[in-house]
């Protein structure tokens, strides 16, 4: 913008200078006569303001409007002209000079018009792009697939947002009319801080022309490639399928807008995006950082599962809980994930957990329900095995639906089992929730039947009981009885290795007491406890936290015989 203004000012100054030069050109031709023959006297005395030259018996002078040849008074002075006949205009040579200068002016004016048109076109493209990526209420397509393969989620973030700057090659700016709409393709730029707009050519080169050897995952609505960016960083490039519909551009732009607003250590960041026509098809891609260990489900099923100690599993659960807590309570706007599962929890080489795949996310209103919808969802979106009962039956999603899904993830961390898998007799499929709920009611069965065999019994029984209890609370049928993600984080913080000295603050006898007494004391640790915690300290939800969950007002309750079912 600054360069365009400077160019316009320079052109204006040149035109003013030319006008001044043109104003100084001789515009009178005088034919003068003299009585003397000494040309040197005439030139020095009478033609100082004009350009005079002898022509046979007369003189031809080219004079400006404010200076004419000197004429002798009464015609008696032989040292000056006796008479002159002046007329407006120029000689043939001066006319040629005037025409050449006029041509220069026309050329400069033509260039100025071209620059103005280019500036106007760039402004139209800028307005088009600004309207396209302006703040909108995020919406989700009803026909979008629930998820993509777990290996498609290999996304990583090793640095902060301020370090996520990438060198992008420039491309030719232009606007194209296609499908009766103005689609602008401009020079790659940054939006929302460190979110970059990549060119399709650059991402094509990064993935070796989207080679099948670069594919790291498939899904119903996308394919994910591993790519090498120009700065040497490895990225996960999610290439979206081209759905049919008039709202495709809106859905994509709102998804980019939503992802660009999220900045938290436990949420996978977006590096950039690409949206442009390539041939007859619109290409839409999202670029994330690469996660070296893949998804939680991949680790539990693969060789890395042998290395997942109990302490690592607690840390993973706490990190994922903090990511969801940020989405529910600190993001602007607050976000409902709607597809919480182990394949959407990614791990880096240090076992740090991050939440990903917000393709089905919804913004939340002040009451915790998804905004823009006052009626149940017409079609279920998500993954079987993680659906909350109220969502599967009535189609009503809320923060507590995410809490239920997170409870299933906790069961996966405890047992190592998949949410839905074939039983040993190979008859049908068995739900992890249905299998685990009866065992969660008995502290003895929790220790003997729930733990993953890969743990080889290497875990603290008290921590296992707390984790199992938390999973059971998240899986309660009544959404209002489930803990919030803030409360989940507080409970997990009591057993994380970094707060081992605070484990005794949680009353272990509370876990398996009778339902009536549990309801009475639930206020003490859940609603009231978190409330007092908010009054005592201010919590920064934008960064990882290691606060403790203290229960000074809750007295331990002795285990009663009726507690076991």
From Swiss-Prot:
PTM (free text): Phosphorylated.
Entry-annotated residues carrying Phosphothreonine: 378, 383
Enzyme class: transferase
Entry GO CC: endomembrane system; endosome; endosome membrane; plasma membrane
Active site residues according to the UniProt entry: 339 (proton acceptor)
Residues that bind ATP: 216-224, 238
Phosphotyrosine PTM positions: 391
MF terms (GO), sorted A to Z: ATP binding; GTPase binding; protein serine kinase activity; protein serine/threonine kinase activity
Intervals, Extracellular compartment: 24-103
Keywords: ATP-binding, Cell membrane, Endosome, Glycoprotein, Kinase, Membrane, Nucleotide-binding, Phosphoprotein, Receptor, Serine/threonine-protein kinase, Signal, Transferase, Transmembrane, Transmembrane helix
Domain called Protein kinase: residue spans: 210-495
Chief subcellular location: membrane
Any GO BP annotation: xylem development
Subcellular location: Cell membrane; Prevacuolar compartment membrane; Endosome
Residues of the signal peptide: 1-23
Glycosylation sites: 27, 37, 45, 77, 85
Membrane topology listed for this record: Single-pass type I membrane protein
Cytoplasmic topological segments: 125-565
EC number: 2.7.11.1
One Pfam short name: Pkinase
Catalytic reactions on record: L-seryl-[protein] + ATP = O-phospho-L-seryl-[protein] + ADP + H(+); L-threonyl-[protein] + ATP = O-phospho-L-threonyl-[protein] + ADP + H(+)
Family as reported in the entry's similarity comment: Belongs to the protein kinase superfamily. Ser/Thr protein kinase family.
PANTHER family: OS01G0750732 PROTEIN (PTHR47989), RECEPTOR-LIKE SERINE_THREONINE-PROTEIN KINASE NCRK ISOFORM X1 (PTHR47989:SF23)
Protein name, as recorded: Receptor-like serine/threonine-protein kinase NCRK
Organism name: Arabidopsis thaliana (Mouse-ear cress)
């Amino acid at each position: 913008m600054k360069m365009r203004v400077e160019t316009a000012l320079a052109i204006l100054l040149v035109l003013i200078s030319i006008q001044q030069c043109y104003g100084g050109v001789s515009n009178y031709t005088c034919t003068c006569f003299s009585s003397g023959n000494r040309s040197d006297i005439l030139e020095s005395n009478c033609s100082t303001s004009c350009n005079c030259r002898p022509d046979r018996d007369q003189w031809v002078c080219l004079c400006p409007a404010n200076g004419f040849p000197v004429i002798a008074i009464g015609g008696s002075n032989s040292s000056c002209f006796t008479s002159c006949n002046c007329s407006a205009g120029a000689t043939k040579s001066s006319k040629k000079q005037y025409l050449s200068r006029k041509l220069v002016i026309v050329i400069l004016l033509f260039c100025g018009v071209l620059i103005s048109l280019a500036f106007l076109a760039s402004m139209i493209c800028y307005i088009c792009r600004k309207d396209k990526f302006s703040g909108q209420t995020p919406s989700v397509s009803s026909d979008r697939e629930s998820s993509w393969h777990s290996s498609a989620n290999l996304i990583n973030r090793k640095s902060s947002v301020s370090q996520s700057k990438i060198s992008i090659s420039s491309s030719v700016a232009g606007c194209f009319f296609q499908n009766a709409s103005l689609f602008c393709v401009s020079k790659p730029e940054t939006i929302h801080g460190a979110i970059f707009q990549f060119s399709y050519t650059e991402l094509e080169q990064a993935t070796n022309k989207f080679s099948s050897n670069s594919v790291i995952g498939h899904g119903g609505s996308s394919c994910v490639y591993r790519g090498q960016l120009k700065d040497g960083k490895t990225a996960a490039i999610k290439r979206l399928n081209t759905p049919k519909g008039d709202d495709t551009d809106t859905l994509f732009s709102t998804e980019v807008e939503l992802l660009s607003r999220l900045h938290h250590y436990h949420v996978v960041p977006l590096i950039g995006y690409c949206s442009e026509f390539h041939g007859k098809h619109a290409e839409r891609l999202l670029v994330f950082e690469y996660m070296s260990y893949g998804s939680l489900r991949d680790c539990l099923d693969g060789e890395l599962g042998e290395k997942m100690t109990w302490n690592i599993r607690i840390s993973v659960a706490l990190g994922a809980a903090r990511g969801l807590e940020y989405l529910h309570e600190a993001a602007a706007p607050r976000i409902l994930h709607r597809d919480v599962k182990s394949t959407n929890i990614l791990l880096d080489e240090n076992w740090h957990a991050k939440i990903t795949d917000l393709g089905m996310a919804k913004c939340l209103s002040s009451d915790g329900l998804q905004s823009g919808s006052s009626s149940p969802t017409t079609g279920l979106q998500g993954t079987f095995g993680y659906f909350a009962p109220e969502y599967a039956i009535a189609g009503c999603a809320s923060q507590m639906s995410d809490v239920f899904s997170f409870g299933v993830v906790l069961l996966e961390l405890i047992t190592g089992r998949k949410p839905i898998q074939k039983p040993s007799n190979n008859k049908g499929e068995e739900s992890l929730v249905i299998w685990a709920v009866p065992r969660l009611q008995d502290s003895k069965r929790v220790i003997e039947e729930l733990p993953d065999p890969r743990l080889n019994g290497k875990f603290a029984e008290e921590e296992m009981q707390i984790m199992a209890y938390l999973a059971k609370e998240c899986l309660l049928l009544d959404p209002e009885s489930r803990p919030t993600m803030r409360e989940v984080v507080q409970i997990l913080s009591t057993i994380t290795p970094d707060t081992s000295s605070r484990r005794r603050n949680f009353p272990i006898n509370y876990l398996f007491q009778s339902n009536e007494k549990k309801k009475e004391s639930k206020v003490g640790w859940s609603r009231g406890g978190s409330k007092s915690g908010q009054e005592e300290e201010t919590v920064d939800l934008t960064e990882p936290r290691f606060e403790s969950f203290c229960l000074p007002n809750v007295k331990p309750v002795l285990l009663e015989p009726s507690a076991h079912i």
